[in-house]
Amino acid sequence: MESNLQGTFLLNNTQLAQFSEMKAPMCQYSVQNSFYKLSPPGLGPQLAAGTPHGITDILSRPVATPNSSLLSGYPHVAGFGGLSSQGVYYGPQVGSFSKAGNEYPTRTRNCWADTGQDWRGSARPCSNTPDPLSDTIHKKKHTRPTFTGHQIFALEKTFEQTKYLAGPERARLAYSLGMTESQVKVWFQNRRTKWRKKSALEPSSSTPRAPGGASGDRAASENEDDEYNKPLDPDSDDEKIRLLLRKHRAAFSVLSLGAHSV
């Protein structure tokens, strides 16, 4: 039993050995023969012996030129050595260019990167250049006007006489005080609002005036004259305005008569 297995194994090994010896030369011969048939006549002497696809053989090959003997072995490739103009390859209009293709500068950046940079650059919100629209908005910002003491005195005196002004009366008062009708109208609106709030919170009561000497009255009069020449705020200088109205009542009567005569 064992002898039969050994004989069979030896027989099989012998057949395998013969098969490998028979196949190996045929494979080598077929590769060498096919490589020989594909190679041109002038290529054999220039290539070194060995595997044609090795790194050493590939690096040791000479550089092929249009006029070299490597291309001359192929009849359909040898004809390209005589072509000198670009028009033969690309068309007649290309041959009219004075420069070769490699002499023109090439773009190294990607077109998508350039496009992205353009739209990203246009969307940048921050810039050092001033915006004319924002400047116009800041210039149009409403600023509260400041009136002189003479203007506030006349306005307060007129408000004591009447809480509402008609169109002609408002125009005459604005002209006599050097103001605009809009300023007079807004001042009267604010003054009426303040008067209503004050009337609702405080009951009307008269405060007695404290007695004082002549020297004290003179000093107070000088201080009032100084305050009269300074700008006053109708929302915060109520006491000063009341004193000025009491002192210059006669002067304002002359002013009101002159304004109505105009």
From Swiss-Prot:
One of its GO terms (molecular function) is DNA-binding transcription repressor activity, RNA polymerase II-specific. Its main location: nucleus. One of its GO terms (biological process) is neuroendocrine cell differentiation. GO terms for cellular component: nucleus. It is found in: Nucleus. Residues 140-199 bind DNA. The keyword DNA-binding applies. The keyword Membrane does not apply. Expressed in the developing CNS and gastro-intestinal tract. Keywords: DNA-binding, Homeobox, Nucleus, Transcription, Transcription regulation. Residues 197-237 are annotated as: Disordered. Gene3D superfamilies: Homeodomain-like. This is Homeobox protein Nkx-6.3. It comes from Mus musculus (Mouse).
